[in-house]
């Protein structure tokens, strides 16, 4: 994948996360979302955080959550964990739901 393709696909991930948080905040959630360049920080009501950031040199998207640090690479049309193969949005849904204490579903 070229650098241009990576940036387009990775920025789409960040945009999808931002959209989901905006919709969740219209409902029962109160998630603070801060974007600084290619880093998104989600802060939940209990003070816990999830950080999603782009890693252009490696062509990856990373998640840092209470559950740990995870690296995702674009494989066969989806962002997949480099160790487990778990799909990015499925994993983020699990981590955010655990940390928020309320269900929240992320998708592309």
Swiss-Prot record:
Gene3D superfamilies: Frataxin/CyaY (3.30.920.10). GO terms for cellular component: cytosol. One of its GO terms (molecular function) is ferric iron binding. InterPro entries: CyaY, Frataxin/CyaY, Frataxin/CyaY_sf, Frataxin_CS. Pfam families: Frataxin_Cyay (PF01491). HAMAP family: CyaY. Belongs to the frataxin family. This is Iron-sulfur cluster assembly protein CyaY. It comes from Burkholderia cenocepacia (strain HI2424). The gene is cyaY.
């Amino acid at each position: 994948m070229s650098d241009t393709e990576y940036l387009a696909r990775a920025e789409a991930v960040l945009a999808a996360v931002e959209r989901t948080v905006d919709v969740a905040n219209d409902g029962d959630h109160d998630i603070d979302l801060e974007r600084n360049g290619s880093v998104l920080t989600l802060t939940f009501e209990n003070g816990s955080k999830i950080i999603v950031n782009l890693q252009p040199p490696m062509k990856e998207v990373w998640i840092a959550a209470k559950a740990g640090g995870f690296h995702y690479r674009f494989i066969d049309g989806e962002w997949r964990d480099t160790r487990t193969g778990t799909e990015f949005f499925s994993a983020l849904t699990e981590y955010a739901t655990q940390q928020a204490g309320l269900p929240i579903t992320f998708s592309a």
